[in-house]
């Protein structure tokens, strides 16, 4: 599906943010035996996700209103979950961010699914009930 340049910018930014989140997660796994270092990396992951809503506003402004609302809702959900994990200080919650309960290794995480749907559905992206 053809994407507008504005949507392409949003998708590229989300892909970059996803890569940064995964780098933080991989860094945490690499130091799993060192609890303070593991905690710091998981907090970094959560802070990156918490920033999606605010940082994404500039990308959303350029999109059609319905897509702004739909994509903005998803960014809000990612950010709200991460802010909650940081607020309560749960490292387990931080580690589970982006992964549904039934997630299996090798399956895409929730942010990857969102990015893929934006890429595939373009301006016609709409929320699913599970979103």
Give the location of each predicted region.
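Short amphipathic alpha-helical segments that mediate assembly, nucleic-acid/protein binding
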Residues: 3, 7, 45, 53-56, ...
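Generic structural concept
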Residues: 11-14, 18, 46, 50-53, ...
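Short, solvent-exposed, charged loop/turn and helix-capping segments
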Residues: 49-79
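Amphipathic alpha-helical binding modules
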Residues: 77-131
């Amino acid at each position: 599906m053809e994407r507008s340049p504005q949507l392409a910018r949003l998708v590229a930014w989300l892909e970059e943010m996803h890569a940064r989140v995964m780098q933080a997660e991989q860094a945490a796994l690499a130091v799993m035996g060192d609890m303070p270092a593991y905690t710091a990396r998981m907090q970094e992951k959560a802070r990156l996700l918490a920033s999606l809503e605010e940082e994404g506003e500039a990308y959303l402004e350029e999109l059609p209103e319905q897509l702004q609302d739909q994509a903005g809702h998803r960014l809000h959900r990612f950010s709200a979950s991460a802010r909650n994990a940081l607020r309560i200080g749960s490292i387990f919650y931080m580690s589970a961010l982006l992964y549904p309960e039934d997630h299996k290794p090798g399956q895409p995480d929730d942010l990857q699914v969102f990015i893929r749907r934006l890429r595939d559905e373009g301006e016609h992206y709409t929320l699913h009930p599970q979103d």
